[in-house]
Amino acid sequence: MVTYALLGATGATGSSILRHLLQKSPDSLHIQVLVRSKVKLLQAFPDLETTRRPQVHVIQGMSTDSDALSECLRNASIVFMCVAQNGSPIGTTLCQDSARPIISVLQQQQQSEGASYQPCTIVQLRSASLNPALAAQVPAFVHRIVSFCLFANYADIKQACQYYSEAQKQGTLEYILVDPPTLHDANGTHPTGYRLISTEPQATALSYADLGAAMCEIAHRESEFHGRAVGVTATGRVRQTWGVLLRHLLEGGSSRLRETIAKEAVVVRVLCIFLVILACLMSSL
């Protein structure tokens, strides 16, 4: 029996993955889902507890809880890492704070199982903005604006990916990075078409439903993509919801701007103090 673990199933990405797995997966699949709120998950998937094909086991807990993670990751060959935070608040560390205990649990399994240990594959949602080949397709000024506004979120994801890269070198896990463009229609449930890419042209918008289907295909073809970044592009019509994205950009940009101004103010104050001290020393000569 193949086992998939899904972290963050109540978010737009996680729910789209779960929906696709429930509809398209073989009956032999076993899905282990870790969520903060089981009630919220069952509101979105009311038949989940009675589903027998595929089998679904729901674990309530935090993505930083070692016991909950150990239960969720047990025997999993694929781990969908969909824990994320809307916006880009300064200082966010959610992705890396989740990556560290995941790696720790897998290291414990590696030590206990010894030579029989089979590393699982982490399928980590990233962004086309962090993929040089795909980011180069976007006008430079747009890329700079987005990178400025989502700086904290991107820094968090990059650090988490660095942890996975280091763990891969130790044989603890494999990883695949999934790089979609802007994501839309969080409430949509029907894919309209997508294609996996590396450096080919990427459409500006992709629906969450198509992202979920794409991540499931990537998991099915995992051996082709280990240690690589995989882009996703839409091939069908996408219901675009730019208002949500613009709000996240505005919130992230405002936070980054306030941080930048605060840092500059500190530098100015230190410089003023230095000049005052220097003036006092010179007047005493």
From Swiss-Prot:
Topology class, membrane: Single-pass membrane protein
Enzyme class: oxidoreductase
Superkingdom assignment: Eukaryota
GO cellular component: membrane
EC number: 1.-.-.-
The keyword Oxidoreductase is assigned to this record: yes
Gene3D superfamilies in alphabetical order: NAD(P)-binding Rossmann-like Domain
Principal location: membrane
Keywords: Glycoprotein, Membrane, Oxidoreductase, Transmembrane, Transmembrane helix
Pathway in which this enzyme or protein is active: Mycotoxin biosynthesis; aflatoxin biosynthesis
Keyword Disulfide bond: no
Annotated compartments: Membrane
Membrane-crossing residue ranges in chain numbering: 265-285
GO BP annotations, alphabetical order: aflatoxin biosynthetic process
GO molecular function annotation: oxidoreductase activity; oxidoreductase activity, acting on the CH-NH group of donors, NAD or NADP as acceptor
Glycosylation site positions: N75, N187
Family: Belongs to the avfA family.
Purpose: Averufin oxidase; part of the gene cluster that mediates the biosynthesis of aflatoxins, a group of polyketide-derived furanocoumarins, and part of the most toxic and carcinogenic compounds among the known mycotoxins. The four major aflatoxins produced by A.parasiticus are aflatoxin B1 (AFB1), aflatoxin B2 (AFB2), aflatoxin G1 (AFG1) and aflatoxin G2 (AFG2). Within the aflatoxin pathway, the averufin oxidase aflI catalyzes the conversion of averufin (AVF) to versiconal hemiacetal acetate (VHA).
Protein name: Averufin oxidase A
Organism: Aspergillus parasiticus (strain ATCC 56775 / NRRL 5862 / SRRC 143 / SU-1)
Classification lineage: Eukaryota, Fungi, Dikarya, Ascomycota, Pezizomycotina
